Amino acid sequence: VCVRLARNLFKTSDFIQCRRVILAVSGGSDSLALLFLVKEYLETLSAPLEIIAVTVDHQLRKESAREAETVAKICRSHHIKHITVRWEGKKPKTHIASSARVARYNLLVQEAQKQGASLIMTGHTLNDQVETYQMRSQRLQKRRGLLDDDASVMRDGFSAGGFAGAWRGEVGAMGDEDHAKETRKNITEKNDGVLYERGLSCIPREALLHRKIRLIRPLLGVKRQTLRNYLSIQGKMWIDDPTNEDRNFERVRVRQSLSSQKLADIAQKINQAALQRRQHAQNIADLILALDIRVQYGRCFIKKPASLLHKNACFPFVVGLFAVLMGGGFYLLPSKKLSMLVQKLCLHSSEKQRFTYAGCVIEYNKDGIALWREGRNMKEALVGTEETLIWDGRYKITNHGSEAIKVGAANLEQLKSLLKNSNFNLEKPHFPSLQSLLMISNDKGYDIPELISQAIIHKNVIIKRIMAPFDWLSSREDAALVNVVEPFFNLEVKR
Protein backbone atom coordinates (compact mmCIF):
# COMPACT_ATOMS: atom_id res chain seq x y z
CA VAL A 1 0.00 0.00 0.00
CA CYS A 2 2.76 2.41 0.99
CA VAL A 3 4.82 1.78 -2.14
CA ARG A 4 1.71 2.15 -4.32
CA LEU A 5 0.89 5.47 -2.64
CA ALA A 6 4.42 6.71 -3.24
CA ARG A 7 4.38 5.71 -6.91
CA ASN A 8 1.09 7.50 -7.53
CA LEU A 9 2.34 10.78 -6.08
CA PHE A 10 5.45 11.41 -8.13
CA LYS A 11 6.23 11.91 -11.79
CA THR A 12 9.44 10.87 -13.48
CA SER A 13 9.85 14.50 -14.57
CA ASP A 14 9.81 15.65 -10.93
CA PHE A 15 13.39 14.50 -10.46
CA ILE A 16 14.81 15.11 -13.93
CA GLN A 17 18.36 16.55 -13.96
CA CYS A 18 18.35 16.53 -10.18
CA ARG A 19 21.12 15.12 -7.96
CA ARG A 20 19.82 16.32 -4.60
CA VAL A 21 16.37 17.20 -3.31
CA ILE A 22 15.59 19.46 -0.37
CA LEU A 23 12.60 18.31 1.69
CA ALA A 24 11.04 20.86 4.04
CA VAL A 25 10.35 18.83 7.19
CA SER A 26 8.83 20.47 10.26
CA GLY A 27 8.02 17.23 12.06
CA GLY A 28 4.28 17.46 11.48
CA SER A 29 2.36 14.61 9.89
CA ASP A 30 2.34 16.12 6.39
CA SER A 31 6.07 16.78 6.12
CA LEU A 32 7.09 13.51 7.78
CA ALA A 33 4.86 11.59 5.37
CA LEU A 34 6.54 13.47 2.52
CA LEU A 35 9.97 12.49 3.86
CA PHE A 36 9.24 8.77 3.96
CA LEU A 37 7.22 8.69 0.73
CA VAL A 38 10.03 10.38 -1.19
CA LYS A 39 12.56 8.00 0.39
CA GLU A 40 10.50 4.96 -0.63
CA TYR A 41 9.99 6.25 -4.16
CA LEU A 42 13.64 7.12 -4.74
CA GLU A 43 14.68 3.64 -3.60
CA THR A 44 12.79 2.24 -6.60
CA LEU A 45 14.94 4.24 -9.03
CA SER A 46 18.12 2.88 -10.58
CA ALA A 47 20.12 5.94 -9.52
CA PRO A 48 18.66 7.30 -6.27
CA LEU A 49 19.01 10.98 -5.45
CA GLU A 50 20.39 12.33 -2.21
CA ILE A 51 17.70 13.51 0.21
CA ILE A 52 18.43 16.50 2.42
CA ALA A 53 15.78 17.21 5.06
CA VAL A 54 15.71 20.86 6.12
CA THR A 55 13.83 22.09 9.18
CA VAL A 56 13.16 25.82 9.42
CA ASP A 57 13.17 27.00 13.01
CA HIS A 58 11.19 30.25 12.89
CA GLN A 59 12.05 30.90 16.54
CA LEU A 60 8.48 32.03 17.21
CA ARG A 61 7.72 29.39 19.87
CA LYS A 62 9.90 28.12 22.69
CA GLU A 63 9.30 24.52 21.57
CA SER A 64 10.63 25.08 18.05
CA ALA A 65 14.30 24.24 18.78
CA ARG A 66 13.31 21.00 20.50
CA GLU A 67 11.04 20.07 17.59
CA ALA A 68 13.88 20.65 15.13
CA GLU A 69 16.11 18.33 17.16
CA THR A 70 13.36 15.69 17.15
CA VAL A 71 13.30 15.81 13.34
CA ALA A 72 17.10 15.55 13.31
CA LYS A 73 16.93 12.36 15.41
CA ILE A 74 14.31 10.83 13.13
CA CYS A 75 16.48 11.56 10.10
CA ARG A 76 19.61 10.13 11.74
CA SER A 77 17.78 6.91 12.53
CA HIS A 78 16.92 6.54 8.83
CA HIS A 79 20.34 7.69 7.55
CA ILE A 80 18.95 10.88 6.02
CA LYS A 81 20.99 14.07 6.01
CA HIS A 82 19.32 16.77 8.13
CA ILE A 83 19.96 20.50 8.48
CA THR A 84 18.26 23.07 10.71
CA VAL A 85 18.13 26.67 9.49
CA ARG A 86 16.85 29.54 11.61
CA TRP A 87 14.88 32.68 10.94
CA GLU A 88 17.12 35.16 12.71
CA GLY A 89 16.54 38.78 13.61
CA LYS A 90 13.63 40.87 14.79
CA LYS A 91 10.23 39.47 13.89
CA PRO A 92 7.38 41.65 12.56
CA LYS A 93 4.47 42.45 14.86
CA THR A 94 1.86 42.14 12.10
CA HIS A 95 1.36 39.78 9.14
CA ILE A 96 3.52 37.25 10.94
CA ALA A 97 2.22 34.25 8.96
CA SER A 98 2.98 35.75 5.53
CA SER A 99 6.34 37.10 6.72
CA ALA A 100 7.26 33.68 8.10
CA ARG A 101 6.31 32.08 4.78
CA VAL A 102 8.60 34.42 2.82
CA ALA A 103 11.43 33.88 5.30
CA ARG A 104 10.90 30.10 5.19
CA TYR A 105 11.14 29.85 1.40
CA ASN A 106 14.11 32.21 1.25
CA LEU A 107 15.95 30.05 3.79
CA LEU A 108 15.09 26.90 1.84
CA VAL A 109 16.38 28.46 -1.39
CA GLN A 110 19.60 29.57 0.31
CA GLU A 111 20.17 26.06 1.64
CA ALA A 112 19.35 24.51 -1.74
CA GLN A 113 21.96 26.69 -3.41
CA LYS A 114 24.48 25.90 -0.68
CA GLN A 115 23.88 22.14 -1.09
CA GLY A 116 23.79 22.20 -4.89
CA ALA A 117 20.13 21.13 -5.01
CA SER A 118 17.83 22.28 -7.80
CA LEU A 119 14.58 20.98 -6.27
CA ILE A 120 12.62 21.74 -3.09
CA MET A 121 9.58 19.72 -2.02
CA THR A 122 7.03 20.66 0.63
CA GLY A 123 4.24 18.66 2.26
CA HIS A 124 1.18 20.77 1.42
CA THR A 125 -1.92 18.57 1.29
CA LEU A 126 -5.42 18.63 -0.18
CA ASN A 127 -6.61 20.05 3.15
CA ASP A 128 -4.22 23.01 2.81
CA GLN A 129 -5.43 23.55 -0.74
CA VAL A 130 -9.11 23.51 0.18
CA GLU A 131 -8.58 25.78 3.18
CA THR A 132 -6.76 28.29 0.97
CA TYR A 133 -9.61 28.23 -1.55
CA GLN A 134 -12.21 28.73 1.16
CA MET A 135 -10.35 31.68 2.70
CA ARG A 136 -9.89 33.40 -0.65
CA SER A 137 -13.47 32.69 -1.66
CA GLN A 138 -14.79 34.20 1.57
CA ARG A 139 -12.70 37.32 1.05
CA LEU A 140 -14.11 37.69 -2.44
CA GLN A 141 -17.63 37.33 -1.10
CA LYS A 142 -17.00 40.06 1.46
CA ARG A 143 -15.95 42.31 -1.39
CA ARG A 144 -18.90 41.27 -3.55
CA GLY A 145 -20.50 44.69 -3.37
CA LEU A 146 -17.27 46.25 -4.56
CA LEU A 147 -16.93 43.70 -7.33
CA ASP A 148 -20.50 44.34 -8.43
CA ASP A 149 -19.70 48.04 -8.59
CA ASP A 150 -16.66 47.26 -10.70
CA ALA A 151 -18.75 45.10 -13.02
CA SER A 152 -21.24 47.95 -13.36
CA VAL A 153 -18.45 50.32 -14.29
CA MET A 154 -17.21 47.77 -16.80
CA ARG A 155 -20.67 47.50 -18.37
CA ASP A 156 -21.43 51.20 -18.43
CA GLY A 157 -18.07 52.94 -18.51
CA PHE A 158 -15.90 51.17 -21.07
CA SER A 159 -15.57 48.40 -23.58
CA ALA A 160 -12.78 46.73 -25.45
CA GLY A 161 -14.29 48.33 -28.52
CA GLY A 162 -13.37 51.65 -26.95
CA PHE A 163 -9.78 51.02 -27.95
CA ALA A 164 -10.90 50.75 -31.56
CA GLY A 165 -12.96 53.91 -31.32
CA ALA A 166 -10.14 55.92 -29.84
CA TRP A 167 -7.67 54.86 -32.49
CA ARG A 168 -10.19 55.61 -35.27
CA GLY A 169 -10.71 59.08 -33.79
CA GLU A 170 -14.41 58.50 -33.20
CA VAL A 171 -16.42 60.41 -30.60
CA GLY A 172 -19.33 58.72 -28.87
CA ALA A 173 -20.76 55.48 -30.25
CA MET A 174 -18.53 52.80 -31.67
CA GLY A 175 -20.57 52.38 -34.82
CA ASP A 176 -21.61 48.75 -34.51
CA GLU A 177 -23.72 48.96 -31.34
CA ASP A 178 -24.57 45.25 -31.26
CA HIS A 179 -20.89 44.37 -31.43
CA ALA A 180 -20.09 46.95 -28.75
CA LYS A 181 -22.70 45.49 -26.38
CA GLU A 182 -21.40 41.98 -26.92
CA THR A 183 -17.83 43.15 -26.37
CA ARG A 184 -18.77 44.89 -23.12
CA LYS A 185 -20.40 41.68 -21.93
CA ASN A 186 -17.41 39.55 -22.93
CA ILE A 187 -14.76 41.79 -21.44
CA THR A 188 -16.62 41.98 -18.13
CA GLU A 189 -16.91 38.20 -17.90
CA LYS A 190 -13.47 37.40 -19.20
CA ASN A 191 -11.60 40.00 -17.19
CA ASP A 192 -13.38 38.75 -14.08
CA GLY A 193 -12.12 35.31 -15.04
CA VAL A 194 -8.56 36.42 -15.69
CA LEU A 195 -8.41 38.03 -12.28
CA TYR A 196 -10.52 35.98 -9.92
CA GLU A 197 -9.66 32.48 -11.06
CA ARG A 198 -5.97 33.34 -10.72
CA GLY A 199 -6.38 33.40 -6.95
CA LEU A 200 -8.87 30.56 -6.71
CA SER A 201 -6.50 28.16 -8.46
CA CYS A 202 -4.72 28.31 -5.08
CA ILE A 203 -1.48 26.41 -4.49
CA PRO A 204 0.20 25.16 -7.69
CA ARG A 205 1.76 21.71 -7.68
CA GLU A 206 4.87 23.12 -9.31
CA ALA A 207 6.44 26.56 -9.19
CA LEU A 208 9.79 28.27 -9.60
CA LEU A 209 11.51 30.05 -6.70
CA HIS A 210 13.90 32.91 -7.46
CA ARG A 211 13.63 31.92 -11.16
CA LYS A 212 16.05 29.02 -10.57
CA ILE A 213 14.93 26.52 -7.91
CA ARG A 214 11.98 24.22 -8.66
CA LEU A 215 9.33 23.93 -5.95
CA ILE A 216 7.07 20.86 -6.07
CA ARG A 217 4.22 19.98 -3.71
CA PRO A 218 3.44 16.34 -4.56
CA LEU A 219 0.86 15.77 -1.79
CA LEU A 220 -1.68 18.39 -2.93
CA GLY A 221 -4.13 15.70 -4.00
CA VAL A 222 -3.90 13.69 -0.77
CA LYS A 223 -5.99 14.18 2.36
CA ARG A 224 -4.13 14.76 5.61
CA GLN A 225 -5.88 11.81 7.25
CA THR A 226 -4.60 9.49 4.51
CA LEU A 227 -1.05 10.57 5.31
CA ARG A 228 -1.59 10.06 9.03
CA ASN A 229 -2.95 6.59 8.37
CA TYR A 230 0.17 5.89 6.31
CA LEU A 231 2.43 7.00 9.19
CA SER A 232 0.41 5.06 11.77
CA ILE A 233 0.66 1.84 9.76
CA GLN A 234 4.43 2.20 9.91
CA GLY A 235 4.39 3.04 13.61
CA LYS A 236 5.73 6.54 13.09
CA MET A 237 4.76 9.48 15.30
CA TRP A 238 4.55 13.14 14.37
CA ILE A 239 4.62 16.48 16.16
CA ASP A 240 1.35 18.35 16.70
CA ASP A 241 1.77 22.11 16.40
CA PRO A 242 -0.52 23.72 19.03
CA THR A 243 -1.21 26.67 16.74
CA ASN A 244 -3.10 24.26 14.46
CA GLU A 245 -5.93 24.35 17.03
CA ASP A 246 -5.75 28.09 17.78
CA ARG A 247 -8.97 29.70 16.52
CA ASN A 248 -7.33 33.10 16.53
CA PHE A 249 -6.00 32.06 13.13
CA GLU A 250 -8.34 32.30 10.13
CA ARG A 251 -7.06 29.05 8.64
CA VAL A 252 -7.91 27.10 11.81
CA ARG A 253 -11.47 28.46 11.85
CA VAL A 254 -11.91 27.53 8.20
CA ARG A 255 -10.38 24.08 8.75
CA GLN A 256 -12.79 23.28 11.56
CA SER A 257 -15.78 24.32 9.44
CA LEU A 258 -15.04 21.98 6.52
CA SER A 259 -16.83 18.64 6.19
CA SER A 260 -15.55 15.70 4.12
CA GLN A 261 -18.16 16.34 1.43
CA LYS A 262 -17.27 20.01 1.25
CA LEU A 263 -13.61 19.03 0.93
CA ALA A 264 -14.42 16.95 -2.16
CA ASP A 265 -16.66 19.61 -3.70
CA ILE A 266 -14.09 22.38 -3.28
CA ALA A 267 -11.31 20.15 -4.63
CA GLN A 268 -13.23 19.94 -7.93
CA LYS A 269 -13.62 23.73 -8.03
CA ILE A 270 -9.88 24.18 -7.48
CA ASN A 271 -9.03 21.85 -10.36
CA GLN A 272 -11.39 23.78 -12.62
CA ALA A 273 -9.94 27.12 -11.51
CA ALA A 274 -6.41 25.87 -12.19
CA LEU A 275 -7.39 24.79 -15.71
CA GLN A 276 -9.00 28.18 -16.33
CA ARG A 277 -5.94 30.03 -15.05
CA ARG A 278 -3.70 27.97 -17.33
CA GLN A 279 -5.96 28.68 -20.30
CA HIS A 280 -6.13 32.40 -19.51
CA ALA A 281 -2.35 32.51 -19.28
CA GLN A 282 -2.14 30.84 -22.69
CA ASN A 283 -4.70 33.26 -24.17
CA ILE A 284 -2.74 36.24 -22.87
CA ALA A 285 0.52 34.75 -24.17
CA ASP A 286 -1.02 34.21 -27.62
CA LEU A 287 -2.22 37.81 -27.71
CA ILE A 288 1.19 39.17 -26.71
CA LEU A 289 2.80 37.16 -29.52
CA ALA A 290 0.26 38.55 -31.99
CA LEU A 291 0.84 42.17 -30.92
CA ASP A 292 3.75 44.35 -32.04
CA ILE A 293 5.47 45.12 -28.72
CA ARG A 294 8.95 46.53 -28.20
CA VAL A 295 10.81 47.10 -24.94
CA GLN A 296 14.06 49.04 -25.23
CA TYR A 297 16.02 51.55 -23.15
CA GLY A 298 13.37 51.80 -20.44
CA ARG A 299 10.41 52.27 -22.80
CA CYS A 300 7.71 49.85 -23.91
CA PHE A 301 5.69 50.55 -27.05
CA ILE A 302 2.56 48.62 -28.05
CA LYS A 303 1.82 49.47 -31.67
CA LYS A 304 -1.79 50.04 -32.67
CA PRO A 305 -3.03 46.49 -33.30
CA ALA A 306 -5.44 45.15 -35.87
CA SER A 307 -9.11 45.52 -34.99
CA LEU A 308 -9.53 41.90 -33.94
CA LEU A 309 -6.63 42.13 -31.49
CA HIS A 310 -7.54 45.33 -29.67
CA LYS A 311 -11.09 44.03 -29.20
CA ASN A 312 -9.66 40.96 -27.49
CA ALA A 313 -10.89 40.72 -23.89
CA CYS A 314 -7.31 40.09 -22.72
CA PHE A 315 -5.94 43.32 -24.23
CA PRO A 316 -6.49 45.47 -21.09
CA PHE A 317 -4.75 42.79 -19.03
CA VAL A 318 -1.75 42.93 -21.38
CA VAL A 319 -1.51 46.72 -21.04
CA GLY A 320 -1.81 46.41 -17.26
CA LEU A 321 0.83 43.68 -17.20
CA PHE A 322 3.40 45.76 -19.07
CA ALA A 323 2.53 48.81 -16.94
CA VAL A 324 3.40 46.83 -13.81
CA LEU A 325 6.59 45.41 -15.33
CA MET A 326 7.79 48.80 -16.60
CA GLY A 327 6.81 50.50 -13.33
CA GLY A 328 8.56 47.98 -11.11
CA GLY A 329 5.41 46.77 -9.35
CA PHE A 330 5.55 43.57 -7.32
CA TYR A 331 1.93 42.53 -7.96
CA LEU A 332 -0.31 42.33 -11.01
CA LEU A 333 -3.19 44.80 -11.08
CA PRO A 334 -6.26 43.74 -9.07
CA SER A 335 -9.71 43.93 -10.65
CA LYS A 336 -10.56 47.44 -9.48
CA LYS A 337 -7.31 48.93 -10.76
CA LEU A 338 -7.60 47.08 -14.05
CA SER A 339 -11.10 48.44 -14.63
CA MET A 340 -9.87 51.96 -13.80
CA LEU A 341 -6.96 51.55 -16.20
CA VAL A 342 -9.28 50.58 -19.04
CA GLN A 343 -11.49 53.61 -18.35
CA LYS A 344 -8.44 55.84 -18.64
CA LEU A 345 -7.32 54.16 -21.85
CA CYS A 346 -10.71 54.47 -23.55
CA LEU A 347 -10.13 58.06 -24.64
CA HIS A 348 -12.27 58.93 -27.65
CA SER A 349 -9.68 61.22 -29.16
CA SER A 350 -6.94 60.93 -31.76
CA GLU A 351 -4.76 63.40 -29.84
CA LYS A 352 -1.95 62.33 -27.55
CA GLN A 353 -3.07 61.58 -23.99
CA ARG A 354 -0.88 60.84 -20.98
CA PHE A 355 -1.45 59.67 -17.40
CA THR A 356 0.43 57.82 -14.66
CA TYR A 357 -0.61 54.44 -13.31
CA ALA A 358 1.04 51.68 -11.28
CA GLY A 359 4.27 53.69 -11.09
CA CYS A 360 4.28 53.99 -14.86
CA VAL A 361 3.67 56.77 -17.39
CA ILE A 362 1.21 55.65 -20.06
CA GLU A 363 1.06 57.71 -23.25
CA TYR A 364 -1.74 56.94 -25.65
CA ASN A 365 -2.20 58.20 -29.23
CA LYS A 366 -3.32 57.06 -32.68
CA ASP A 367 -0.11 55.07 -33.16
CA GLY A 368 -0.30 53.00 -30.01
CA ILE A 369 0.57 52.96 -26.31
CA ALA A 370 3.95 53.89 -24.83
CA LEU A 371 4.84 53.02 -21.24
CA TRP A 372 7.83 53.92 -19.08
CA ARG A 373 8.73 54.21 -15.39
CA GLU A 374 7.32 57.27 -13.68
CA GLY A 375 10.11 59.69 -12.75
CA ARG A 376 9.70 59.67 -8.98
CA ASN A 377 10.37 57.50 -5.92
CA MET A 378 13.47 55.97 -7.50
CA LYS A 379 15.71 56.12 -4.45
CA GLU A 380 19.46 55.80 -4.40
CA ALA A 381 20.93 52.86 -2.49
CA LEU A 382 24.27 51.31 -1.62
CA VAL A 383 25.18 47.73 -2.52
CA GLY A 384 27.97 46.44 -0.31
CA THR A 385 30.62 43.89 -1.21
CA GLU A 386 29.11 40.43 -1.83
CA GLU A 387 25.60 41.83 -1.44
CA THR A 388 22.58 41.55 -3.72
CA LEU A 389 19.95 44.27 -3.96
CA ILE A 390 16.68 44.52 -5.86
CA TRP A 391 16.43 48.15 -6.93
CA ASP A 392 13.09 49.76 -7.81
CA GLY A 393 11.47 46.36 -8.42
CA ARG A 394 13.22 46.25 -11.81
CA TYR A 395 16.89 45.43 -11.37
CA LYS A 396 18.79 42.88 -9.33
CA ILE A 397 22.36 44.03 -8.63
CA THR A 398 24.99 41.67 -7.24
CA ASN A 399 28.27 43.25 -6.20
CA HIS A 400 31.29 40.92 -6.21
CA GLY A 401 33.66 43.88 -6.24
CA SER A 402 36.00 45.12 -3.53
CA GLU A 403 34.01 48.24 -2.64
CA ALA A 404 30.39 49.33 -2.24
CA ILE A 405 28.60 50.84 -5.21
CA LYS A 406 25.82 53.42 -5.38
CA VAL A 407 22.79 52.69 -7.54
CA GLY A 408 20.02 55.02 -8.66
CA ALA A 409 18.22 56.45 -11.67
CA ALA A 410 20.17 57.86 -14.60
CA ASN A 411 20.80 61.61 -14.36
CA LEU A 412 19.67 63.80 -17.28
CA GLU A 413 22.89 65.80 -17.44
CA GLN A 414 25.01 62.67 -17.34
CA LEU A 415 22.81 60.99 -19.95
CA LYS A 416 23.29 63.86 -22.38
CA SER A 417 27.03 63.88 -21.74
CA LEU A 418 27.20 60.14 -22.28
CA LEU A 419 25.30 60.26 -25.57
CA LYS A 420 27.44 63.16 -26.77
CA ASN A 421 30.84 61.75 -25.86
CA SER A 422 30.42 58.01 -26.49
CA ASN A 423 30.06 55.94 -29.62
CA PHE A 424 26.53 55.05 -28.56
CA ASN A 425 24.14 56.16 -31.31
CA LEU A 426 20.50 56.59 -30.33
CA GLU A 427 18.21 58.22 -32.85
CA LYS A 428 15.66 60.58 -31.25
CA PRO A 429 16.48 59.73 -27.62
CA HIS A 430 13.46 59.68 -25.31
CA PHE A 431 14.95 61.18 -22.16
CA PRO A 432 11.99 60.59 -19.77
CA SER A 433 12.38 56.82 -20.23
CA LEU A 434 16.19 56.94 -20.42
CA GLN A 435 16.17 58.63 -17.01
CA SER A 436 14.52 55.53 -15.55
CA LEU A 437 17.51 53.35 -16.44
CA LEU A 438 19.80 52.09 -13.71
CA MET A 439 22.98 54.08 -13.09
CA ILE A 440 25.82 52.91 -10.85
CA SER A 441 28.34 55.47 -9.65
CA ASN A 442 31.07 56.49 -7.23
CA ASP A 443 33.50 59.39 -6.83
CA LYS A 444 35.37 58.33 -9.96
CA GLY A 445 32.43 58.42 -12.34
CA TYR A 446 29.26 56.67 -13.42
CA ASP A 447 28.10 53.77 -15.54
CA ILE A 448 24.73 53.16 -17.24
CA PRO A 449 24.95 49.43 -18.08
CA GLU A 450 22.08 49.31 -20.59
CA LEU A 451 23.72 52.00 -22.72
CA ILE A 452 27.40 51.11 -22.37
CA SER A 453 28.81 47.79 -23.51
CA GLN A 454 32.00 48.04 -21.45
CA ALA A 455 32.43 48.93 -17.79
CA ILE A 456 33.81 52.39 -17.11
CA ILE A 457 34.43 52.31 -13.38
CA HIS A 458 32.95 49.14 -11.91
CA LYS A 459 34.21 45.57 -12.05
CA ASN A 460 32.71 42.29 -10.84
CA VAL A 461 29.13 43.55 -10.83
CA ILE A 462 26.14 41.64 -12.23
CA ILE A 463 23.00 43.56 -13.23
CA LYS A 464 19.86 41.67 -14.20
CA ARG A 465 16.48 43.09 -15.28
CA ILE A 466 13.75 41.28 -13.37
CA MET A 467 9.97 40.90 -13.58
CA ALA A 468 9.05 41.45 -9.93
CA PRO A 469 5.60 39.72 -9.92
CA PHE A 470 7.24 36.51 -11.16
CA ASP A 471 10.75 36.81 -9.76
CA TRP A 472 10.29 35.46 -6.23
CA LEU A 473 7.71 32.77 -6.98
CA SER A 474 6.32 31.86 -10.37
CA SER A 475 3.44 29.39 -10.69
CA ARG A 476 3.52 26.61 -13.27
CA GLU A 477 0.02 27.70 -14.25
CA ASP A 478 1.49 30.99 -15.53
CA ALA A 479 4.35 29.36 -17.45
CA ALA A 480 2.95 30.19 -20.90
CA LEU A 481 2.58 33.85 -19.96
CA VAL A 482 5.97 34.17 -18.25
CA ASN A 483 7.81 32.41 -21.08
CA VAL A 484 6.43 34.88 -23.62
CA VAL A 485 7.06 38.01 -21.55
CA GLU A 486 10.52 37.09 -20.25
CA PRO A 487 12.42 37.76 -23.52
CA PHE A 488 11.30 41.41 -23.41
CA PHE A 489 13.23 41.82 -20.15
CA ASN A 490 16.06 39.38 -20.77
CA LEU A 491 18.87 41.73 -19.80
CA GLU A 492 21.89 40.55 -17.85
CA VAL A 493 25.06 42.64 -17.77
CA LYS A 494 28.23 41.23 -16.25
CA ARG A 495 31.05 43.66 -15.56
Language model segments and positions:
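ATP-dependent adenylation/nucleotidyltransferase module used to activate substrates
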Residues: 1-196, 225, 233, 444
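AMP-forming adenylation/ATP pyrophosphatase catalytic core
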Residues: 6, 13-26, 52, 87, ...
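Bulky hydrophobic/aromatic packing residues
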Residues: 36-41, 84-93, 120-121, 213-219, ...
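Generic structural signal for bulky hydrophobic/aromatic residues embedded
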Residues: 41, 103, 111, 206, ...
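Short, solvent-exposed polar/charged micro-motifs at secondary-structure junctions
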Residues: 93-96, 250-252, 416
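Flexible helical/loop "lid" subdomain adjacent to adenine-nucleotide binding pockets
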Residues: 117, 125-177, 183-331
